[in-house]
């Protein structure tokens, strides 16, 4: 079955170009041209991925992202203006998975779509026999096969990307990972040197797993280098 893509952009020529090229790649494509219609369309079609412009009539892209994240975890790629760094950061903090700046290459955007779909919907390897893949770090337990974690027995709700990042760090306990390395391994493609994505995702993770995010006990910053997961006895 073909993957569903919702394209949201108030510039119809851009939406039409994306629709044409995505259909050539075998996707089912649905378009909306304002924020209110976008929310309705996403709820109706429940797509596998959303391409979401920020500047929209009605609700803007940030509001749409916030609303959709209340119910769905599909990847969201934000389409941002060339120099709007604040929009990129806010979009990521609201739960967007990726962003592409305008003007963009259609080929690049389709590559991002494929990468996000591959990362989000890839299935973890099935456990065999009675072997457990659980990873315990102090009072946190990671369940890789279930893509879930618990802290002191309570579920912690993570996005797919947040889980992937935390799980990767847990497999390399105590090793400092540069932002560039994390982009390559966790996101799975080159972010063209923009490492803010990692910082924002780390901040979201800390807010969910740390007792005091301003003094983290799990995800530690090595200033000027990157991040590592602190070992605990």
UniProtKB/Swiss-Prot annotation:
GO biological process, one term: regulation of DNA-templated transcription
Primary subcellular site in the record, as a coarse category: cytoplasm
Modified residues (Phosphothreonine): 101
Family matches, as SUPFAM superfamilies: C-terminal effector domain of the bipartite response regulators (SSF46894), CheY-like (SSF52172)
Molecular function via GO: phosphorelay response regulator activity; transcription cis-regulatory region binding
Record localization: Cytoplasm
Protein modification: Phosphorylated by WalK on Asp-53. Phosphorylated by PknB on Thr-101.
Protein name: Transcriptional regulatory protein WalR
Species: Staphylococcus aureus
């Amino acid at each position: 079955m073909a993957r569903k893509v919702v394209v949201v952009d108030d510039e119809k020529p851009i939406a039409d170009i994306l629709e044409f090229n995505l259909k050539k790649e075998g996707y089912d494509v649905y378009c909306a041209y304002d924020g209110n219609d976008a929310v309705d369309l996403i709820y109706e079609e429940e797509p596998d991925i959303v391409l979401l412009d920020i500047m929209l009539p009605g609700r803007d892209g940030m509001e749409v992202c916030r609303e959709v994240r209340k119910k769905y975890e599909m990847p969201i790629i934000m389409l941002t203006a060339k120099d709007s760094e604040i929009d990129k950061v806010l979009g990521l903090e609201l739960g967007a998975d990726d962003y592409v700046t305008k003007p963009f290459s259609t080929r690049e955007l389709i590559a991002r779509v494929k990468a996000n779909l591959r990362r989000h919907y890839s299935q973890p390897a099935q456990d065999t026999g009675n072997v457990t893949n659980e990873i315990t770090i102090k009072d946190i337990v990671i369940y890789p096969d279930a893509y879930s974690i618990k802290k002191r027995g309570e579920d912690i709700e993570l996005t797919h990307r947040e889980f992937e990042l935390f799980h990767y760090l847990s497999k390399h306990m105590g090793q400092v990972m540069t932002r560039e390395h994390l982009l390559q391994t966790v996101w799975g493609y080159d972010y063209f040197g923009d490492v803010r994505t990692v910082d924002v995702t780390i901040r979201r993770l800390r807010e969910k797993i740390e007792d005091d995010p301003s003094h983290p006990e799990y995800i530690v910053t090595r200033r000027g280098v990157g991040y590592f997961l602190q070992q605990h006895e």
